[in-house]
Amino acid sequence: MEAPRRLTLALCVACGLGLALTSARAAEDLTPVLSLTPGQVLRLAGPQLGLSTQYPWLVRTPPPGLLVSAPPGHLELTAREALPWRVVETNHGALLVRTRDGVPVKLAWQGEPGQAVSAAGNFNDWNGASHPLTEVAPGRYQLDLLAAPGELIYLLKVGERYLRDPANPDSIPNGFGSWNSRRVLQDEGGAPPRLRRLGWTRQGEGRVVSFLAEGLGADWSWAGLHGNQALAETAVSRAGDTLRVRLGAGPTLGPDRLRFAVSRGTRRSTLQTVFLDSAFVWQDAVVYALMPDRFRNGDPANDAPVRHPDLLGPANWQGGDLAGILACLDEGYFRRLGVNALWIYPLNESTDQAWQEYPEPHRWYTGYHGYWPVHPTRIEPRFGDSLLFRQVVDRAHAQDMRVLLDLVANHVHQEHPWVTEHPDWFGSLLLPDGRRNLRIWDEQRLTTWFEPYMPDIDYGAHPEAVDAMCEVALKWVDGYGLDGFRHDAVKHVPRELWEGLTRWMKAGVPDKPFYQIGETFGSDELIQSYVGPDALDAQFNFNLFHPAREVFLDSTRSFEELARILELNLANYGANSLMGNLMDSHDKARWPSLAEGDLPLSGANGQEIGWTKPPENDDPRTYDKTRLFLTWLLGLPGVPFLYYGDEIALAGAEDPDNRRMMRFGAQLSELERRQLELTAELVRVRRTRPELRRGDLEIVHAGHDVLVFLRSAEDEQGRPSRSLVALNKSGRPQRAELRLPLGLGSRTLELKPWEGRILPL
């Protein structure tokens, strides 16, 4: 067994890395888990590590196989080869390090000599230029790459055409009415070791945390941090398959949490995070997302729909407002549902006109959704005023609810004062080659415009624009007591803005767990690149959201496939990340309408169906299928988000049909009322079971139609707390014979058609 080595080497890191973390806030931040690609240098600045920038740094001698250097202002790490879990110690805190797993892949194309051929996919964020195929013989092209285990989704770009791989018959819908090629990549290195939690006991001022370890063998090692401090070499003992970790009193660096993992050779367990205090963390949240204009009309006096001959009702203002949200708070709607956080869509004053959408068929829309701001801090009069919003936040806080606000930072509407006051802050709509830089999502990721009337802010070239947006954000926080932000279009904004914003928030609100979650569609690597102590806390887990929807609703797809994706997701993000999980969103067709069969899973024609034949819930089984997916959602690690209407299985095709007015009380059918009650019960179970909020996840059964996983954690006294989440996606009764770990024995589960159950053990 190998424990971390502890010789000390002094490495000096220069000052001047920007605003240092305040000591109060720094004590709450965990250092990031670093993933290294063997042979490549990972260069990080002090704030990216969540460590103090005070001079000097003392870095202990790196573990075997890892090179560490400290050029001015940075830390550089290089893995010579695949590594087990490692710890890198500094005098300001310690870091957990691992290497990325990869599977060799060969892509080929047979065509004409002299063609421009490349590959684009989830491995390179759909960049059609970064991975060219080499012409190895006349007309024969080849690319060798190392891809992450799991699903490889890709297309071949030949000239200007994106084509499926003719050598690969496996394909998957792309969500826009077409198809991508797919390969499922298996890691052939053998099963990794597994850690299971056995609880903790008090010992003097400290604790002893116990784990059951399987598959260790003789060549095993461990890595662990208490808060942000490395464990002592003598902290871990082994008796058979039981590991005991002895901790002292709470750490002086970082929160009172144990992060612990084991390795067998270079095969690594998932990282376990044991929460040793019960103070609120965002893993405890169930967030309710609402679009003010489409939620509830509490004050008809401020209704002001736009008049335009070509503007249709679903694209116009509907009358929802802050008074409606306040009424729901006063009536106890959110409290009865059980949610403990609200995400309120943007409240900025919006344009008072209708504007034509660039893509065909060029429909007209208003800014009812909030994403066309014409002022940085003024509240849209149709929603209310600053006094009313302050009442909403205060009333939510009085009910022990936190409030997130949607912050629009990527762009503004052309009527925004910054457009005339600071025209140089905005990128050009025209590219050097003469094309309009509109919706070129990947090739022009950081500069593309969403619409010709929505100028894109060029933060990379204008640091003063970064400061201006950070000042705006702090005004919203200081003015209303916000608890966090949801950030729009994160991948289209340079990281400099998110770093600046996080510095401002940590300096401005150091004494509470301020949560920032972003929206990025792309690879796990791209998503993770915006997450860290110096940037966002989390992003939405779209790389689990999309395949889960498809597997649940496609009878030909197996839960075995989803189980592999889930395990890869856990390996990437950990079982105790703050990633946001969804059933629905304002950008996607609603789950009940997919379950009803009114919309194709491929996404083809989803928007037109919303305009020409809006779906409705005609089949009572749609409510069963919706409860099934909500059971999955509320049983997962991370932070669950309910999009308004999920609790009643509200129907809807794609935007704007997925943004219908919410309905309440007597407006609900009997099936909808029953759905509301059962959703509240699922939320209650989530809120009261620590393993669902703070626990690990182990898949104990994955068949074609039945998936069962075990969630395990500890209660406030350290005793094991466990639940099974069992799901049947078929229209037939199913039986699952389970052999449970941890001495929990065997049991037979009987599941009704489309049934999901959470079973405390």
Q: Where on the chain are the PLM-derived regions?
A:
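Surface-exposed, short loops/turns at beta-strand junctions within beta-sandwich domains
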Residues: 75-82, 146-150, 249-256
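Carbohydrate-binding surface patches
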Residues: 700-739
